[in-house]
């Protein structure tokens, strides 16, 4: 592994940890994503964070995701994450389930295998973190009862 790849892997581990230390399951292979999505219960809700190394992921996407997923009254059954740019095959497989234009960071909320909510990067970057959190809260309140 070259120095750049080693550095990015180390940085990504810290960023991944911001989610996994708060209950998110990291899906790091295509097989892990497929296995998870194909076994999920039809009545379960799954909140997916497509993680990224960019500043808007660090300052907005991850903190908002953690706050709402751990503190909101209505919460998803499951919380998972894939890391764009790091776990490329896993991210590509998750994007096949999402069926939206590739965007990272981004959020997806599923009921079973049905996408019920999606927030792409352009609705994260440059916004106030409280507005992002309120959008997630509204999606959870509507779909995670």
Swiss-Prot record:
UniProt-listed InterPro entries: BrxB/BrxA (IPR009474)
Domain of life assignment: Bacteria
Pfam families associated with the record: Disulph_isomer (PF06491)
GO terms classed as biological process: cell redox homeostasis
Family listed: Belongs to the bacilliredoxin family.
Name listed for the protein in its UniProt record: Bacilliredoxin SAOUHSC_01436
Organism encoding this protein: Staphylococcus aureus (strain NCTC 8325 / PS 47)
């Amino acid at each position: 592994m070259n120095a750049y790849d080693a550095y990015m892997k180390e940085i990504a581990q810290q960023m991944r940890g911001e989610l996994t230390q708060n209950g998110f399951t990291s899906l790091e292979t295509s097989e892990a994503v497929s296995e998870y999505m194909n076994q999920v219960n039809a009545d379960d809700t799954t909140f997916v964070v497509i993680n990224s190394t960019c500043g808007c992921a660090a300052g907005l996407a991850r903190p908002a995701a953690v706050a709402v997923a751990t503190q909101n009254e209505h919460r998803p059954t499951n919380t998972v994450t894939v890391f764009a740019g790091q776990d490329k095959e896993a991210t590509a497989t998750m994007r096949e389930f999402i069926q939206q234009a590739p965007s990272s960071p981004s959020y997806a909320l599923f009921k079973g295998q049905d996408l019920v909510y999606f927030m792409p990067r352009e609705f994260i970057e440059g916004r106030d973190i409280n507005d992002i959190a309120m959008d997630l809260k509204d999606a959870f309140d509507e779909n995670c009862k």
